[in-house]
């Protein structure tokens, strides 16, 4: 997210269960790349920052999409994650998130 917040010239940014908070919020017009945020709905690490992140991106005029996966916590896309309750692999959420990332890249890069 910090790369996107910096205004870097990249085609798009995807994050799986990434941190959303920052000490340097994006300024209006700075975020150039579309964003796809894939998050576990039960992720206690990101939950406190979601509303602030959404407001920040709206205020910045960013093109963003935030997806919460039910029943998923932090680390949901890492097959080796097995540290309940906060970091656990979720096969269904991981498959859906990877499919969404593929669609996002298809939109950006084409065939």
Indicate where each model-derived feature is located.
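Primarily recognizes the serine-hydrolase "nucleophile elbow" in alpha/beta-hydrolase
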Residues: 1-32
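Short, well-ordered secondary-structure micro-motifs
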Residues: 2, 25-26, 48, 78-80
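N-terminal Rossmann-fold cofactor-binding loop
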Residues: 17, 40-41
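Short, hinge-like loop/turn segments at secondary-structure boundaries
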Residues: 30-34, 83-86
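Short beta-strand/loop motif that positions the catalytic acidic residue
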Residues: 31, 36-39, 69
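Acidic beta-to-alpha connecting loop that harbors the catalytic carboxylate
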Residues: 41-44, 72-73
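Conserved alpha/beta-hydrolase "acid-adjacent" motif
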Residues: 44-52
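C-terminal catalytic histidine-bearing segment of alpha/beta-hydrolase fold enzymes
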Residues: 58-111
